[in-house]
A protein has these predicted regions:
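Di-metal (Zn2+ and/or Mg2+/Mn2+) metal-binding site signature of metallo-dependent hydrolases
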Residues: 1-13
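Active-site microenvironment of metallo-dependent hydrolases
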Residues: 205-221, 225-510
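A generic structural signal for well-ordered alpha-helical segments
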Residues: 16, 47, 114-115, 136, ...
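Divalent-metal coordination cores built from histidine and acidic residues
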Residues: 13-120, 185, 430-434
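Histidine/acidic residue-rich metal-binding segments in metalloenzymes
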Residues: 73-93, 99-165, 172-194, 205-219, ...
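Short, ordered loop/turn segments at secondary-structure junctions
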Residues: 1-2, 28-31, 59-60, 97, ...
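Structural motif
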Residues: 22-24, 52-55, 89-93, 119-122, ...
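Divalent metal-coordination and catalytic microenvironments
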Residues: 20, 92, 156, 197, ...
Length: 510
């Protein structure tokens, strides 16, 4: 998901190619969620002018959410009948376990179409095991990038999956997952690859990209050449593109990294498509972003809000409410937390002392005007609000805050600006990161976006948060494939029950 870096394809290439990343496998699904197939063709055209190759997997469906949320474009089985025949299509992207388990019509249709076109099916199966995993694999999924520990990795590999070990800026699984190779069975390395999934511009500039994962694997005890194979030929074979890339031999594309020391694995020079394109962590030529069409101008098609939109009304005047607060225990762990909150004048009052604040997702594509509202914990905001239109998987507008007034101000500001990320306090903007391309990415230089990322996180921490990436933790909330709770424009979601829930558990009038 290059879009989570908030960098456009052009800017992303400027950041990652000098670190040795020459190809990316992606569904480009965030771009699709805010545009349509015409928008996708624009991104394909942008890729062709970049030194970074993108091997596209057609998203198994959009939206990815259960129950279904709102996006700009719905990717259905009928769409698959067309796009799987495109030359850009190399498979079906990130098929989530629950959609197979529930026999979702579009998902099974996409998989069936892939069988007709001899295309591989890529997976997303966090914490799947036993019979649930067996049934999932029978659908034809060949690989996964969602394992929380090495035991999960080993089970999936023993059942025939190719495993991508993920190390993102908020999920640090590589050291633990690599134990499958360093402690259980070194021969498993042949079917292990790497995945960054979601990384910020800051992370890329400070640590690197795929080269960083190679170094981390070596540090974890993997032989340098084996770690390099994980980042090259193993990945190419997993995605069935090894006839094009992944090795230096006749008939393959000349993507070559020049490295002095395999142990340190610091990339000095990069060749893509037979041309020297990067040296000393910089491209050797000027790369310009394309002129953006109206599809990606970033207009938010939603009405201005008021504080009342973010006030939780209940049918008692005064008293107490027992609420279910979505409690973040990590970027991909959301648990239930029951909290007693005061009710005043018919409105449930957020309580910063109990770390129980409000969170909402506002539909921004002009489809239905949905605004969900729920309670959340873990951010420890004492004041203000923060909001983002970069919010996978739907990229609706997510806002959270200690009070309804600042939440409304943050939403209205992003509507005026055409998208981005903002932190506000007492009706004033503390920091703003503009994302003019579809409301999700920027054509600015990676260094510029990274500097703004740092200021946004610093501003969020000034409101009281002690999370490492407060904004990123927030904008992951709409992902319903993460246990145990999520929030979309359709409402708060119970991952286990695959349905929305009422956050008000009990009311006591006083």
């Amino acid at each position: 998901h290059s879009e989570c870096s908030k960098l456009s394809i052009t800017s992303y290439a400027k950041a990652v190619v000098p670190h040795g990343t020459t190809s990316m496998i992606s569904g480009l699904d965030e771009y699709i969620s805010v545009s349509d197939l015409d928008g996708l063709q624009e991104i394909f055209a942008e890729v062709k002018k970049s030194p970074l190759k993108v091997f596209w997997g057609a998203p198994y469906k959009t939206p990815y959410t259960v129950p279904q949320s709102t996006v700009s474009f719905n990717f259905t089985k009928k769409v698959h009948q067309t796009v799987q025949k495109w030359p850009e299509c190399f498979g079906v992207w990130e098929t989530v376990t629950e959609f197979v388990q529930e026999e979702d019509e579009d998902t099974l249709g996409a998989i069936a179409e892939a069988g007709k076109n001899n295309l591989p099916v890529f997976g997303c199966a966090p914490m799947a095991s036993g019979k649930k995993l067996n049934a999932y694999l029978c659908s034809g999924v060949r690989l996964d990038h969602e394992s929380y520990d090495h035991v999960e990795v080993v089970e999936k590999m023993r059942k025939g999956m190719h495993m991508l070990i993920r190390e993102s800026c908020v999920t640090h699984f590589l050291a633990e997952n690599m134990r499958a190779v360093t402690e259980v069975n070194p021969y498993l390395a042949r079917r292990v690859s790497f995945c960054t999934d979601d990384v910020t511009a800051t992370d890329i500039l400070e640590k690197g990209h795929m080269d960083n994962l190679v170094r981390l694997a070596i540090k974890a005890g993997v032989e340098p050449m084996t770690a390099i194979q994980m980042a090259t030929i193993n990945s190419a074979e997993a995605y069935r593109i090894d006839h094009l890339i992944g090795s230096i031999c006749p008939g393959r594309i000349a993507d070559i990294l020049f490295v002095e020391d395999l142990q340190d694995f610091k990339v000095d020079e990069v060749m893509t498509n037979g041309n020297m394109v990067a040296r000393n962590h910089k491209l050797t030529y000027e790369l310009k972003a394309p002129e953006r069409s109206p599809i990606f101008k970033g207009e938010l098609k939603c009405a201005k809000t008021t504080a009342d939109d973010f006030s939780y009304h209940v049918p008692i005047e005064n008293g107490e409410a027992k609420v279910l607060s979505l409690d973040v225990k990590g970027p991909f762990v959301r648990k239930r937390r029951d909290v007693i909150l005061k009710v005043k004048d018919g409105i449930v009052q957020p309580d910063t002392e109990q770390d129980a604040i409000m969170v909402s997702v506002v539909e921004r594509f002009g489809k239905n005007g949905n605004k969900s509202l729920a309670f959340c914990s873990g951010w420890k905001l004492k004041k203000g609000a923060m909001a983002s239109t970069n919010a996978p998987d739907d990229n609706n507008l997510v806002v959270m805050g200690a009070n309804a007034e600042d939440m409304s101000f943050a939403v209205n500001y992003l509507i005026e600006q055409g998208g981005g990320q903002v932190v506000v306090e007492d009706g004033k903007v503390i920091e703003f990161l503009p994302l003019p391309v579809g409301g999700i990415v920027s054509d600015d230089e990676p260094e510029v976006v990274a500097a703004k990322e740092a200021k946004i996180d610093e501003a969020a921490r000034s409101l009281g948060s002690d999370l490492p990436n407060p904004m990123m933790y927030m904008f992951f909330l709409p992902i319903t494939a993460i246990p145990d709770y999520a929030l979309t424009d359709a409402g708060p979601v119970d991952y286990c029950a695959l349905t929305t829930y009422d956050p008000i558990l009990e009311l006591v009038e006083k």
